[in-house]
A protein has these predicted regions:
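Short secondary-structure transition/capping segments
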Residues: 38-42, 103-112
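Conserved catalytic scaffold of divalent metal-dependent phosphoesterases
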Residues: 1-82
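Short amphipathic alpha-helical surface micro-motifs
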Residues: 8-10, 43-44, 100-103, 115-117
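Glycine-centered flexibility sites
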Residues: 29-30, 83, 102, 123
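Intrinsically disordered, low-complexity regions enriched in small/polar residues
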Residues: 38, 49, 100-103, 134
Length: 136
C-alpha cells in the first residue's frame, strides 16, 4: 500500500512483526526488481534486510513468494516471476509454520512445503472464489 493512500491512524507493517492471537506475524511488502518494472520494486539487499527484520516469526506474510520454481511459474502468463532467495534462506533457517504470499496469479503450484514450512499462495483465491483460512 502506498503512503498517500493511508488514512490517519493506519500503519503499514513492512519489515515489522506483530503478535496476533498469541502468534507472531512478520510482514514484508514489495517485490524485487524485474524487467516488468512493477510498482514498489526494491533491490535484493533492501528486501533481504526486511526479511531479516522479521526473522523468527511464526507466520511470514509477503507479497512475493520464496524462490521456489513451482511457486514462481505463472501458467497463464507463461513465465517465471521473481521470487526471493533471501526469503527461501530464512524459511530454511528458521522454519516458520507458514509463509503466505500472492503475486503469481495462476501458479503452477498453489502450495509447497519447504522443510516444516507450508508456503501458500493465498492470492490464488481469486481464481477459486474461496479465500484461504489459516487454521492452527
Amino acid at each position: 500500500m502506498w503512503a498517500e493512500h493511508l488514512r490517519p491512524g493506519h500503519h503499514v507493517l513492512d519489515g515489522e512483526q506483530v503478535e496476533l492471537g498469541g502468534r507472531t506475524f512478520g510482514f514484508v511488502g514489495g517485490g524485487l526488481r524485474s524487467p516488468y518494472r512493477t510498482p514498489n520494486e526494491i533491490d535484493d539487499d533492501a528486501y533481504a534486510a526486511k526479511v531479516a527484520a522479521v526473522s523468527g516469526a511464526d507466520v511470514l506474510c509477503t507479497h512475493i513468494p520464496p524462490a521456489v520454481p513451482e511457486l514462481l511459474y505463472d501458467t497463464v502468463a507463461r513465465r517465471l516471476e521473481r521470487g526471493s532467495a533471501a526469503l527461501l534462506a530464512e524459511i530454511k533457517r528458521s522454519q516458520p509454520r507458514y509463509v503466505l504470499f500472492g503475486h503469481v496469479h495462476q501458479p503452477l503450484a498453489r502450495r509447497v512445503r519447504v522443510g516444516r514450512t507450508e508456503c501458500i499462495n493465498v492470492g490464488h483465491f481469486r481464481a477459486t472464489g474461496r479465500p484461504y483460512v489459516l487454521a492452527w
